[in-house]
């Protein structure tokens, strides 16, 4: 246990174009090796492509996609009496966002389109429509939680 008390969470500055903290967090998730400018370019270009594909507000489509990706339940391993149980538990809102963004970026990188902008745009559009690999990951996580519902009483 720490004796110094709780550590304050650093507040993220909203991005200059859409004035959204969620966009900044997404850009930070995309960023590799501290190259934030490149990550911003990728994200903003992807949103432009989303606008051309869907003819809708790209931020609205992005929020819709993220809502379809964010998990509500997950399983956590709990050791009881020498056995490991997969115990379903609810996901905190903050972790929901970070998991959703992480999965979005991870499965975007695994797509086959030529540029990262294209991949991200297509994954956002697919996720907003309810298909796409990142949405499948969420459904798989929920299936695991549902299958292990019997161990819910081990929750802590």
Swiss-Prot record:
Classification via SUPFAM superfamilies: Ribosomal protein S7
Q: Which GO terms describe its molecular function?
A: rRNA binding; structural constituent of ribosome; tRNA binding
Q: Which cysteines are joined by disulfide bonds?
A: none
- Tell me one GO biological process term: translation
Mind telling me which Gene3D superfamilies this protein's record contains? Answer: Ribosomal protein S7 domain
Its keywords, alphabetically, are: Ribonucleoprotein, Ribosomal protein, RNA-binding, rRNA-binding, tRNA-binding
Entry superkingdom: Bacteria
GO cellular component term, pick one: small ribosomal subunit
Q: What's this protein's function?
A: One of the primary rRNA binding proteins, it binds directly to 16S rRNA where it nucleates assembly of the head domain of the 30S subunit. Is located at the subunit interface close to the decoding center, probably blocks exit of the E-site tRNA.
Family according to the record: Belongs to the universal ribosomal protein uS7 family.
Quaternary state and interactors: Part of the 30S ribosomal subunit. Contacts proteins S9 and S11.
The protein depicted here goes by the name Small ribosomal subunit protein uS7
Which source organism?
A: Aster yellows witches'-broom phytoplasma (strain AYWB)
The primary gene name is rpsG
């Amino acid at each position: 246990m720490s004796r110094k008390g709780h550590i304050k969470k650093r507040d993220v500055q909203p991005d200059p174009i859409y004035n959204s903290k969620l966009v900044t967090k997404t850009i930070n998730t995309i960023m590799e090796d501290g190259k934030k400018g490149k990550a911003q370019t990728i994200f903003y270009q992807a949103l432009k492509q989303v606008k051309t594909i869907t003819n809708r507000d790209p931020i609205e489509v992005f929020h819709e996609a993220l809502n379809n990706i964010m998990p509500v339940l997950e399983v956590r391993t709990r050791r009881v009496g020498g056995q490991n149980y997969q115990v379903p538990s609810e996901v905190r809102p903050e972790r929901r966002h970070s998991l959703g963004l992480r999965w979005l970026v991870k499965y975007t990188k695994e797509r086959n389109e030529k540029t990262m902008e294209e991949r991200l745009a297509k994954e956002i559009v697919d996720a907003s429509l309810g298909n796409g690999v990142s949405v499948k990951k969420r459904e798989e996580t929920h299936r695991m939680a549902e299958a292990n519902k019997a161990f819910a009483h081990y929750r802590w």
